[in-house]
């Protein structure tokens, strides 16, 4: 069974970082680079992402867009204080995807696992801080 996203379990408890102007700027850069790439490739979002994840597609505008993704990931990692984390961007197989379509331009599987572990730990720390401040009433412990 694959991973699932449910807002109540994922988004509402996600340990977010504080808003940073640099992330806003990179988000705008990503939006513009993606729009420009869609215009140059004459494709919509879905087909653009197929090109991004295809290592045979090496047009300059795709390389630029991939670099914006790398920059965004690096800045988010830094915002969490994880300067030590090696993201290892490249074309990697993603085991959760269908066998005939597993390659994505993304961070390595090891980096992905490490990020999930760090986010889990951070979520627990923040929750404990909230418990200590009395924000959750009586907390039940799991047996």
Predicted regions and their residues:
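S-adenosyl-L-methionine
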Residues: 1-143
């Amino acid at each position: 069974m694959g991973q699932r996203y449910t807002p109540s379990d994922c988004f509402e408890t996600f340990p977010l970082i504080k808003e940073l102007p640099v992330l806003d700027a990179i988000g705008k850069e990503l939006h513009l680079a993606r729009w420009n790439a869609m215009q140059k490739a004459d494709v919509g979002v879905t087909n653009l992402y197929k090109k991004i994840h295809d290592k045979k597609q090496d047009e300059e505008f795709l390389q630029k867009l991939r670099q914006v993704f790398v920059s965004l990931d690096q800045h988010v990692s830094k915002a969490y204080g994880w300067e030590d984390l090696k993201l290892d961007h490249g074309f990697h197989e993603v085991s959760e995807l269908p066998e005939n379509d597993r390659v994505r331009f993304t961070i390595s599987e090891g980096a992905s696992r490490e990020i999930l572990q760090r986010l889990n730990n951070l979520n627990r720390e923040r929750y404990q801080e909230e418990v200590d401040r009395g924000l959750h009433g009586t907390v039940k412990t799991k047996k």
